[in-house]
């Protein structure tokens, strides 16, 4: 298979996944559709190295990982997270519940390595899945490498319906209070909706100088420093270099060296994500029907234990912080899918319950900020850190 043939096939599969997800309003996740198509291809006529043949090979994959995670760090606004500290705490405690049950009951039943591999993907997104899959592959644990990917692919099927149900219960409570006059709708002022640009140590470059090369150069330098320091500290602090990339992304943006969302500004984000998604599905080349049948029970068990721990702890902390148990659980559930499903599910719930535009705006203003912060806290930040720590347990 030629380079362009392989590239076209890989992108067609990813595109079909997106189309199905859009048509079903994210009820059927794009990653699930793509995973099924890749499995069918690998079991029939795809060459096992189709992703590598498409040009997505190790050097560019590693580069995209470093740049993407550093980019993710620039998205972190300490001020925004501080304003939503209760949502942040609920999301983190929910993840704590996942870890508590998967690493105790899950590890006891399915084995320590199985729990270690599957837990980080369950607390976040694609980056955590890739970190754990690569670690398992490096140790010759091919079956567990596939488990990391399958966990990432399947967890949304648990998260979507549960979140939708929780948000509808919460929405009914809110809309009843709004219609009775018990809850007021305070529309945010335009100044509150606009992003506050804090003073930076390093002034922002004029827009005309924010070219693709300049933006990527600064992002690359930041990742280089992060990985260099992480490598130097590895004998003393055994944390993945990806964690340092996340931290240095935060610092670089805070001081003004790197702009917020540099990959988006440079027009590179879509291609970087494409590289990572293609790479994660490449791991399914080793997934035989027999292997998947063997993984079905551990997969289901780890997800059940994780979600059970999440619901218990998130509802407890939510009650202590003044949230309803449904809203608290919904915030924690964002760990299973992140953005954009957290936005889509919230909007769908608001549309279903609202009788007019004002009621929809009210419901969105009450639920969406918490859902967005929950997804950002879990998928963008916590999952990378957890995966960076858990790889040392193997």
Give, region by region, the residue ranges found by the protein language model.
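Intrinsically disordered, low-complexity non-transmembrane regions of multi-pass membrane transporters
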Residues: 1-11, 167-216, 348-370
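Structural signature of multi-pass alpha-helical membrane transport proteins
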Residues: 2-58, 72-74, 197-269, 283-285
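Small-residue-rich segments of transmembrane alpha-helices in multi-pass membrane proteins
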Residues: 32-44, 66, 90-103, 120-130, ...
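Hydrophobic alpha-helical transmembrane segments in multi-pass integral membrane proteins
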Residues: 45-47, 101-108, 133-136, 141, ...
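Entry/N-cap segments of selected transmembrane alpha helices
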Residues: 58-64, 72-104, 216-220, 270-276, ...
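Juxtamembrane and boundary regions of transmembrane helices in multi-pass small-molecule transporters
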Residues: 103-111, 151-197, 316-323, 375-394
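Alpha-helical membrane segments and immediately flanking helix-loop junctions
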Residues: 109-150, 154, 162, 324-378
């Amino acid at each position: 298979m030629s380079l362009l043939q392989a590239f076209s096939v890989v992108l067609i599969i990813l595109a079909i996944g997106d189309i199905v997800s859009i048509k079903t309003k994210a009820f059927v996740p794009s990653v699930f559709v793509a995973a099924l198509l890749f499995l069918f291809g690998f079991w029939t006529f795809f060459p096992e190295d189709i992703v590598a043949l498409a040009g997505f090979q190790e050097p560019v994959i590693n580069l995209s990982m470093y740049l993407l995670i550093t980019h993710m760090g620039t998205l972190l606004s300490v001020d925004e997270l501080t304003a939503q500290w209760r949502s942040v705490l609920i999301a983190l405690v929910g993840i704590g519940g996942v870890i508590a049950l998967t690493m105790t009951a899950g590890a006891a039943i399915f084995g320590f390595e199985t729990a270690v591999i599957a837990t980080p993907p369950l607390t976040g997104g694609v980056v955590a899945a890739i970190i754990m899959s690569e670690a398992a592959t490096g140790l010759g644990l091919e079956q567990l490498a596939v488990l990391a990917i399958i966990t990432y692919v399947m967890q949304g099927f648990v998260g979507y319906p549960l979140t939708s149900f929780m948000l509808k219960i919460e929405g009914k409570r809110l809309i009843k209070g709004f219609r009775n006059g018990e809850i007021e709708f305070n529309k945010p002022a335009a100044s509150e909706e606009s992003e506050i640009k804090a003073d930076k140590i390093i002034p922002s470059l004029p827009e005309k100088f924010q070219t693709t090369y300049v933006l990527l150069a600064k992002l690359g330098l930041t990742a280089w420093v992060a990985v260099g320091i992480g490598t130097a500290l590895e004998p003393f602090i055994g944390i993945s270099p990806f964690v340092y990339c996340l931290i240095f992304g935060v610092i670089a943006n805070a001081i003004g060296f790197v702009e917020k969302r540099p990959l988006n500004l440079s027009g590179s984000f879509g291609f970087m994500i494409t590289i990572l998604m293609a790479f994660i599905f490449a791991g399914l080349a080793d997934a035989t029907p027999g292997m998947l049948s063997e993984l079905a029970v551990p997969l289901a068990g780890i997800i059940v234990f994780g979600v059970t721990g999440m619901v218990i702890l998130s509802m407890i902390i939510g009650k202590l912080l003044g949230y309803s148990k449904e809203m608290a659980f919904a915030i924690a559930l964002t760990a299973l899918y992140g953005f954009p499903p957290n936005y889509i599910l919230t909007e769908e719930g608001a549309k279903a319950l609202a009788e007019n535009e004002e009621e929809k705006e009210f419901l969105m203003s009450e639920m969406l900020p918490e859902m967005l912060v929950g997804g950002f806290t879990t998928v963008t930040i916590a999952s990378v850190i957890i995966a960076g720590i858990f790889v040392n347990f193997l």
